[in-house]
C-alpha cells in the first residue's frame, strides 16, 4: 500500500516568468472544455495578463506546488460584486491543489460576498467551491453561480 503525500501548495505574486506556464495551461484542449473557455492566442493572452497586472480591482496569485507553477487564482470585479476564478494545470487535477490554493487565497481576498461561476459539467470545480464554503446562488442552462457569504 502506498501512502499519498500531501502536496505543498503556496501562493505568491504573479511574475512575468509565470506567464508562459499560464499560456500553456489555458491552451490545453481538455482544460478549455472543462472550463467552457476558448483558448487565447499568445498575443491575446499577454494582453489579458497585462490587464490583470494593471487593474487595481484584481488580486492575482500564482499557485506553486513543490516549486512548480501549477496555475493561477484571481479575484476581480468591483466593490459591490467580487468574483473568484482559478486555472489549474491538468497535471494537478484531483490532488487537492485547487482546494488548498483557494483556501489560502480566501485569506487574502476577504471581501464577502464572493461569487464564482462554474459550468454544470465541471464537477471537479463544483466540489472545490463547495469544500471551501460556496453555496448555490443562481443558475442558467449552462452554469451555476455560487456564493461565499462568510
Predicted regions and their residues:
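Conserved GNAT-fold acetyl-CoA-binding loop/helix
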Residues: 30-50
Amino acid at each position: 500500500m502506498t501512502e499519498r503525500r500531501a502536496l505543498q501548495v503556496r501562493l505568491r505574486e504573479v511574475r512575468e516568468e509565470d506567464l508562459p506556464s499560464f499560456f500553456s495551461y489555458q491552451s490545453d484542449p481538455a482544460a478549455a472544455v472543462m472550463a467552457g473557455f476558448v483558448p487565447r492566442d499568445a498575443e491575446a493572452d499577454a494582453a489579458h495578463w497585462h490587464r490583470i497586472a494593471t487593474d487595481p480591482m484584481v488580486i492575482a496569485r500564482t499557485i506553486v506546488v513543490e516549486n512548480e507553477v501549477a496555475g493561477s487564482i484571481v479575484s476581480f470585479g468591483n466593490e459591490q460584486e467580487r468574483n473568484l476564478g482559478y486555472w489549474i494545470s491538468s497535471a494537478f487535477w484531483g490532488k487537492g491543489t485547487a482546494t488548498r490554493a483557494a483556501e489560502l487565497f480566501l485569506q487574502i481576498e476577504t471581501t464577502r460576498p464572493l461569487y464564482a461561476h462554474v459550468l454544470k459539467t465541471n464537477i471537479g470545480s463544483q466540489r472545490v467551491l463547495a469544500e471551501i464554503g460556496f453555496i448555490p446562488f443562481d443558475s442558467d442552462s449552462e452554469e451555476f453561480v455560487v456564493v461565499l457569504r462568510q
